[in-house]
Amino acid sequence: PLDNSTDTVNINKNDVAPMTDGTDLSSDLQNGDVTINTNGTYYIGSVDVTNIVTVKTGVKADLTVENVTMTSATSSPIIIESGAVVNLHINGTNTVTATKIGKAGINVAANSIESDYSILTVDGDGILNVTGTAQASGIGANLKQLHGKIIINGGTINAVGGMKGTAIGGGIRTSGNVSGCTIEINGGIINASAGRYGTAIGGVERQSNAEIIVNGGYIKATAGDSVTYSIGPGRMTPTTEQFGVNNIYINGGSVDGTFRSTDYDKVQDKDGNKLKQVVLTMPDAVEMANKEVTVGSWKTVTDSEAKLYVYVTEGTTGYAVTYAGKIYRTDDIENQTTLTEYSGSDCTCTDANSSIKLSVPDEITVNKIVGQTKIKLTTDFEKSSDCTYPTHILNCTY
């Protein structure tokens, strides 16, 4: 028996079997390809394989990957067929690589008809390194294929696309109209790099109804050679540009990327207000680099130089973020882009000014097997005229 006051037990995490939730497919995947054709919760951990995982049409699967390496020379290592819904949870470090031309690392498929598409949602605290080949995406479409809905809520995603493809989004030689072909980023750290003639995040060629929505997180989007913009449509040839994104909505987050000049009118917030980028710098470039900060209701991280790439409406003058319990702000984003610590008085708004009662929640999300429908209500909130506190939390009840 142990004497709790004197004895110590050291446990190495590598000596402890991982806790699994749901059906463990690790052994099956080591022995061959795996097909998920039943709704359920699944786990794959600590494997290094050349086999593939396919989630069949109509299946809803919660899949956790933990310290997984998947490489395929014949296919996408992970295939999500059109009409399938996958919640992908990432733990540890995971690497997914396609080496066959025209194949995505993680294939999120859609057909060329209305509302026939797959949905991939990624979250977790781990790392996902995913690479596609030429003419395809890292996460998204194969060659001659539309991409489905891609939602990223968390994790560190390092996505690399092939030549004429995208890191996250479409492949080339596509044609069709799928309303759910959206890319939505709500959180996480996303490093997206495209191959030559490709954009990092977006649709390619003739895919229509594609939208990019950013509500939070940090995005570093790097275009391929011969392309001057990293977010939006790609290029089929060195001389031909093809439209692939209808709208780009930025409601939060830090987005380090560029847009084609004709696409800047498409960059807007959820209310349709046109946006412009402002690059802000935290006051300590060493201590505050690669750190999480809060802006209103969403979170992001600074880059390696402690910079934030935020989007604001025309006429915006001030901006404030919270880091380590302190507020950093500027009152003049045009001329003072380095944030300084706020040292003024606390918030003086009364409860009557800072609270509002709603008859229903401010957002209702209806989940369906082939998509989501969101109904949003907005409420104007004005702080007390004499209050100088830079950030305000609106308490909503219903």
Segments (PLM) and residue ranges:
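Surface-exposed loop/turn motifs in large extracellular/passenger domains
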Residues: 52-62, 79-98, 105-132, 139-161, ...
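Thrombospondin type-1
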Residues: 347-357, 363-398
